[in-house]
């Protein structure tokens, strides 16, 4: 779910266009258009909503509900809560029994507590004293290492357990904050295959034939470099400079390495694809990918291996 925010007194901006491109690249179809600071320009709320709808017409938010709100007066907040309740009711809830994969967006030290990391828990549960695996997404970093959870906080309060979907702050034992960086990821030990090569399908309608041969890939809070080998207009093979804990169905955003423009979005089809060595192997693989499910096919994978 995304809240697409545009300020009433500023209107659509270059940053709004970047957000629109990311929404399209990720294939997001659940969201609300929120025009903030309505108290500063109440006469512009309707105009800005109409402008946002025009800009989002080619995305999954074309028919999203919209409302104007003010954090100063409280106007529109109740309507926004209602729209959020309605929207959340239509979206499935991740299982607290799934494997944990928490992409880290911050790490810091608190006196008397030690290292703390924050991120969004999208699936699984984290409890005090859990053992997790820390994987770095920085080039040249060491192998995955085990860490222990000393404490858990969510929404500003200490908890024994945090379940999805939640913002979480985890106090970790025996590791300095300086050795953890944005984009690193905490995992259920042994639950994820770390891969450098994946096959993907375009989900944004952009041709992968036109993508530069080297791009920046965004997944979770990580940004890594990848080499791109197109396999037709809709499919490609990505080779990362570091191993990543990806699964079939993951959505990735592709951006230019220089101008940083959003190039498109892709969904992972295979996290352990076959090598393409023989003449014509690329064309044959393109044909295979056209028939592959974005949710995985266990029987097909067993037969292939």
What spans do the regions from the language model cover?
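Residue-level marker of beta-strand positions
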Residues: 1, 25, 126, 131, ...
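Conserved Switch II/interswitch segment of TRAFAC-class P-loop GTPases
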Residues: 1-47
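Conserved residues at beta->alpha junctions
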Residues: 7, 35, 71, 120, ...
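Short acidic, glycine/serine/threonine-rich loops at helix termini
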Residues: 17, 42-47, 78-81, 116, ...
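Short, compositionally biased low-complexity segments
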Residues: 25-28, 57-60, 273
């Amino acid at each position: 779910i995304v809240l697409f925010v545009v300020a009433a007194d500023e209107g659509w901006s270059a940053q709004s266009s970047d957000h629109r491109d990311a929404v399209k690249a990720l294939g997001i179809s659940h969201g609300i258009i929120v025009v903030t600071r309505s108290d500063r320009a109440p006469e512009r709320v309707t105009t800005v909503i109409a402008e946002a709808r025009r800009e989002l017409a080619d995305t999954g938010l074309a028919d999203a509900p919209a409302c104007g709100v003010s954090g100063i007066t409280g106007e529109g907040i109740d309507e926004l809560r209602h729209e959020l309740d309605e929207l959340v009711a239509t979206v499935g809830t991740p299982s607290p029994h799934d494997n944990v994969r928490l992409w880290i967006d911050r790490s810091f030290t608190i006196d008397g507590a030690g290292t703390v990391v924050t991120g969004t828990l999208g699936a699984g549960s984290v409890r005090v004293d859990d053992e997790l695996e820390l994987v770095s997404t920085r080039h040249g970093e060491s192998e995955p290492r085990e860490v222990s959870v000393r404490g858990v906080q969510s929404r500003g309060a200490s908890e024994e357990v945090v379940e999805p979907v939640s913002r979480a702050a985890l106090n970790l034992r025996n590791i300095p904050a300086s050795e953890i960086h944005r984009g690193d990821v905490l995992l259920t030990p042994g639950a994820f295959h770390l891969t450098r090569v994946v096959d993907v399908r375009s989900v944004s309608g952009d041709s992968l034939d036109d993508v530069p041969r080297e791009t920046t890939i965004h997944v979770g809070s990580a940004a890594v470099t990848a080499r791109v080998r197109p396999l037709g207009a809709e499919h490609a093979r990505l080779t990362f400079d570091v191993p990543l804990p990806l699964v079939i169905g993951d959505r990735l955003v592709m951006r230019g390495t220089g101008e940083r423009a959003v190039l498109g979005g892709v969904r992972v089809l295979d996290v352990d694809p076959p090598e393409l060595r023989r003449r014509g192997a690329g064309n044959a693989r393109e044909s295979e990918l056209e028939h592959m499910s974005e949710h995985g096919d266990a029987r097909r994978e067993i037969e292939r291996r």
